[in-house]
């Protein structure tokens, strides 16, 4: 229950943060013609994952909370579909990188375009842990985009 409350708070913050304007330095970068297609360059922790999901799928991260047997905090049993398998793989990826504190480590990533032409990049300035966690999130978001979302699997 405590973990679910924390996730709800984090997802709520992510919705708020995704609505905030970029800071002045990032706004200046967005004016550069070479970077005009980049919709966001942000340094965040688990909240960054929600931006990747939005870009890759066109859906809010909320749609994936309590979906199937694996989406949300924890998970067990058999994956109910491809989306749920993405969540299971994401959980296992975080587990492989547990020493990096994947739920809280900040990393730098950028998204450009939007669903269905989203591009997600994990920045080269990330250290090993940041790169690994960023890639866990990127792979999961792209996996969500490749699989059919079934609303009846959300509970």
Swiss-Prot record:
Binds 1 Ca(2+) ion. It is found in: Secreted; Nematocyst. Its cofactor is Ca(2+). Pfam families: Phospholip_A2_1. Keywords: Calcium, Cleavage on pair of basic residues, Disulfide bond, Hydrolase, Lipid degradation, Lipid metabolism, Metal-binding, Nematocyst, Secreted, Signal, Toxin. Disulfide bonds join 55-118, 71-87, 86-143, 93-136, 100-129, 122-134. SUPFAM superfamilies: Phospholipase A2, PLA2. Residues 1-19 form the signal peptide. Lacks hemolytic activity on bovine red blood cells as well as neurotoxic activities. This is Phospholipase A2 A2-actitoxin-Ucs2a. GO terms for molecular function: calcium ion binding; calcium-dependent phospholipase A2 activity; phospholipid binding; toxin activity. Its EC number is 3.1.1.4. It is an enzyme of class 3 (hydrolase). Ca(2+) binds at residues 72, 74, 91. It catalyses: a 1,2-diacyl-sn-glycero-3-phosphocholine + H2O = a 1-acyl-sn-glycero-3-phosphocholine + a fatty acid + H(+). CDD domains: PLA2c. Residues 20-42 form a propeptide. One of its GO terms (biological process) is arachidonate secretion. Belongs to the phospholipase A2 family. The active site is at 90, 137. PLA2 catalyzes the calcium-dependent hydrolysis of the 2-acyl groups in 3-sn-phosphoglycerides. GO terms for cellular component: extracellular region; nematocyst. InterPro entries: PLipase_A2, PLipase_A2_Asp_AS, PLipase_A2_dom, PLipase_A2_dom_sf, PLipase_A2_His_AS.
């Amino acid at each position: 229950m405590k973990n679910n409350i924390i996730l709800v708070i984090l997802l709520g913050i992510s919705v708020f943060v995704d609505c905030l304007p970029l800071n002045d330095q990032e706004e200046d970068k967005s004016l550069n013609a070479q970077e005009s297609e980049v919709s966001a360059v942000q340094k965040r922790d688990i909240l960054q994952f929600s931006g990747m999901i939005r870009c890759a799928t066109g859906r809010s991260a909320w749609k994936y909370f309590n979906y199937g047997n694996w989406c949300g905090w924890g998970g067990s049993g058999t994956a109910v579909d491809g989306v749920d398998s993405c969540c299971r793989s994401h959980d296992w990826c975080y587990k492989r990188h547990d020493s990096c504190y994947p739920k809280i480590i900040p990393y730098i990533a950028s998204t450009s375009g939007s669903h269905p032409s989203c591009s997600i990049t994990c920045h080269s300035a990330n250290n090993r842990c940041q790169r690994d966690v960023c890639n866990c999130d990127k792979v999961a978001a792209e996996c969500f985009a490749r699989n059919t979302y079934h609303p009846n699997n959300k509970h």
